[in-house]
Amino acid sequence: MADYGTYLGNGAYLGPDYTAQALHVYLQGMYRYYAKTLYGKSFNKLTTLQQEGIKGKVKEEIRVNRYNAKDKELTLTKAQTAGYQYLLKYYRKAFINNPKQVGLPDNMIKNRTNEYMVKGNKVDQLTAFFFWGAWLSSTNRLGRSYSYTNNWPYDLEAGNVMTPKAMTWTGISVALLVMGVAIAIWVQKKYNFESKAQYQKDVPIIEPDTLPITTSQRKTAKYFALVMVLFLVQILLGELMAHYYVENTFFGIALQNIWPFNLAHSWHLQLVIFWVATTWLGAGIYIVPRVLRREPVRQGILVDVLFWALIFVVGGSMLGEWLTDLGVLNKNWWLFGNRGWEYLELGKFWQYLLIAAMVLWIVMLMRGFVPAMRRKDNQPRTRLVTMLFLGAIAVPAFYCASIFIMPDSHVTFADYWRWWIVHLWVEGIFEAFAVILTGWLLVDMKLTTIKSTIRALYFQLILLLGSGVVGTGHHYFWMGDHSLWLALGASFSALEIVPLSLLVWEAYTHYRVYQDTYHNFPYKTTFIFLMWTGIWNTLGAGALGFLINAPAINYFEHGTQWTAAHAHGSMAGVYGMFSIAIILYVLRNVTVKEFWTAKMEKAIRWSAWLLNIGLAGMVFATLMPVGQLQLADALKYGYWHARQMSFYHEKLISLILWGRMPWDLIFTAGVIILLVVCWKALFHLKKADNQAAAAEYERFAAAETKSQVNEIDE
């Protein structure tokens, strides 16, 4: 259900938040109990004074913690028991007697008992889990005046209001942001932590049209063709999900029985991880002969093995998720099917295979990077290569945090590790690897000096990882963890904006390179997307991230469409645009000169505009306005109300959601153009010549080393 609705605010956004909804229904059941017990009437027949008296009594009653930690026993009052019974009836009707759930097939929940399950009615067991969320979100921690979730979700009838800590640390985080930006800019300028332009100098320039390539480099092209196929499928699934917000079927076709919303959501998230990661793999493989200055023995065979391993993992995991969601795969569902955790839906078997594939990639990199790191002839280049290799190792290393999540893991502990993947791995390690890889590209294309680039990378990585690691805590505000995370998460997530703000200047630098380099500079299409990467890093990851991460806003916003706006702006805007830049760089080097006609480069420029106009429309013309109205609804009626399906069916909301279609189509057109480019590139590849490539790389390295004698390290 986390790929349909949310629990503790985490999950997908079409369905309700089951914590908030269960809390609201649970309270209604208690009201009914006291109305009948005290007055012998239904609650809605009571006077306003009588109703308010019952609400006050219930609010006091649910705040009392009756859990016995020694005996591990929770005692409910008679009214709470009545509320729980009312909750059971509610969900039996919602999931069984009244099965029409938007975007889901009828009677989706089956009473089957498999691994990690206990016997009994599955709807009732699910209800018990929802009730537990309602209880921990409305019952005070022992010795505290706020609940286990720091009084989230917002619900006045439950006594859930924002704690003073949330407001206090929001103010402090804003002050830290202002101070952090000022200090970072001062340090950057004072100690010259910027990449120095080098393209004006008389230095050796790589000419991709005459550059020989090796066998393994030639084979990377198919990785990028696969990337574009996965990218296209991913956005089509996203558009199907967007359509489910406005009607249950797809223009009258009952696709929800074949591709329900939760399956589309699972695939949508998995595919973005797969295609971005595949881009990293392809880029790393291309770089190996460049740093080693020759082709490693039988490297091409390993490239093929890794490629087909990726297809097996992607196809197998998606099939397993499909069969699980349709109720076909039941036995060993957690190994081969859908485990239900957002971004980690793939079964354990596929997860281990993915880790194994990334380890194979590291082995392939080691064959080139380790010998290169031992060289003494060019120390600055060696340091840059070492940074890139360590960044690559971090990609599979930090993904291993996902193996700690098992089907019987406590939700708070499991979500703790899940955010290591969603935030620390995707937003942290991916970002760090992207920053280092960008530096390597700038140096490799002789646009910046090595020494200045290394200094700039050290500075950026210290800021990025120094704030980002602890900044993961802003995901722990309301999930049952310690209130200490309100302070740590608010402070460090604000500081995360500092390095992202500096990327505005990086974006301008890329634009300047694009404008100022000589007319026949071969990588201008790459720099178009690098420029957009910097812009979206500031807008999507930076501005929108800070907007929703401040505790005082996140308390009401958590799990609304503003979260989706941030996710699209950062994931598609940053990693999407950067991945495309990497793809275009490699393709420019491995394809023949005749492929890069003026018409081809014009098509890529069109693609860049279509992608960014479409993405901006999705984020700022649809998700942000809907999120703002949703936030207003939560403030007025309570969080549970803003997450009901009825909210999306309001006339204005429905109109805005229908208005997303043109932006989706524009974005799709941009992807299709890139798909055509990548597939055409497969038929215009250079012939591999390992000996010629080795000779050229040695010549280039010698010329580079000589040029560094005159490089001034300012």
What are these regions (language model features)?
Residues 1, 29, 115-180, 213-233, ...:
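Membrane-entry segments of alpha-helical transmembrane domains in multi-pass membrane proteins
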Residues 1-165:
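Soluble extramembrane regions of membrane proteins in the secretory/endomembrane system
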Residues 3-7, 12-48, 290-291, 297-365:
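Hydrophobic or amphipathic alpha-helical targeting/insertion segments
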Residues 185-195, 202-222, 243-256, 260, ...:
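Juxtamembrane membrane-water interface segments of multi-pass membrane proteins
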Residues 227-238, 306-320, 393-395, 533-538, ...:
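Hydrophobic alpha-helical membrane-insertion segments
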Residues 390-398, 431, 456-472, 498, ...:
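Hydrophobic membrane-spanning alpha-helices of multi-pass integral membrane proteins
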Residues 695-714:
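Short, intrinsically disordered terminal tails adjacent to the first/last structured region
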